Amino acid sequence: MKKPVLFLDFADALGKLRKNDNFLHNLLARHYDVQIVDTPDVLIFTHYGTRNRLYSCKKIFYTQERYLPDWKQCDAAVTSVFTDHSRAYYYPFFAAHRKGEDLVRPANFDCQRILNEPRGFCSFLHKYANHSVRPRTEFFHELNRRKKVDSGGLAFNNVGYEVPGTAGRAKMAFISQYRFHIAFENRLSPGWTTEKFTDAFEAFTVPIYWGDEHALQWFNPKSFVNVRSYKNFAECCDYIMHLENSPSEYAKMLAEPPLKGNQVPEIYSQDKLLEFLVREIDRQEIPAARRRWFWPLTRLRLVKRDRIHGE
C-alpha cells in the first residue's frame, strides 16, 4: 500500500540534526513517505531556538528536557514531563534514551556472576554540583562520610581522572565497576525521569534514586533504593550501609528485575507515540501560527532580527 506523502522539516534542534535520519523522522517513515522540504506542511521543533516562529504550517513541539509547550506556537507536543493538555503526549526521557527490552531480565539471569565481580562501593558521575542541585550535593557528602564514594565527573572528582562525558560507553564502563550508583535528577518535576536512573540498571548496579515518584508506576521498587521514601538523607544512607554490610540483602535487591512484572510497560511504546503523531498531523485545522492576527508582522520582525535572507 502506498504511503501518504508528508512534507516535513525540523527547526531549533541542538547541534547538527540529521533531518533524514533521526528518531522522529524514522518513526514517521513507518506511516508516511517523508520528504524533507524548506516549505513543509508540518514542522517539528524544540526549545533551543526561535526559528520555528518563521513558519505558519502545523507545528509539533518535541523535547527531552523539562520544558512545556507554548500553545501559541504549536498545535501538538511531545514532552518528557506531564501536562494535562489534550494535545500533548507524554514520552519520558528514559523511553527515548533506550529500549525497554534492555531492562528485561532473562530467565537465566546470573546474579551470582555479578556478585563475584570485584566491584567497588558506590559511584557518582556529574559535571557540576552547586546550589541548583543541592540535594545531590548534600547526599554525596552524607554517604561519602560513611564510606568513600568514587566520583568520576567534574563534581567532587576523587578518582584521579575524569570519565569522558556523563553518558555513553564511558559512563557505563565506569558505573559498572560499583555495587551502587547515585542517580539523582537535577530537579523534581512530574514525569521527569531520565537515563540517570535506567543506566544504573543496565550496568547491573543498584540505583540510589532521587526523582519523581511516578517512576514507581513502571519500575520495581524492590530493585533500587528510593531516597524519597526515607525521612532524610541520613536515614537513607544508614540503609545503604546496611545493604553494603549484608551481602545477602544486597544480592536480593540486585536480583530483582528493574521493570514491574519483568515486562516492558506501555509507556515505552513507539507505536502509541506514532499513533498520536499521525492523529495530530492528519487533523484538519487552521494551524496555531495562522490563528494569530499579528502573524505577518511577527514573521517580518524575526526575519530582520535573525537576518534570514530569502524568507
Feature map (PLM): residue ranges:
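Pol beta-like nucleotidyltransferase catalytic core
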Residues: 2-62, 67-150, 155-183, 190-311
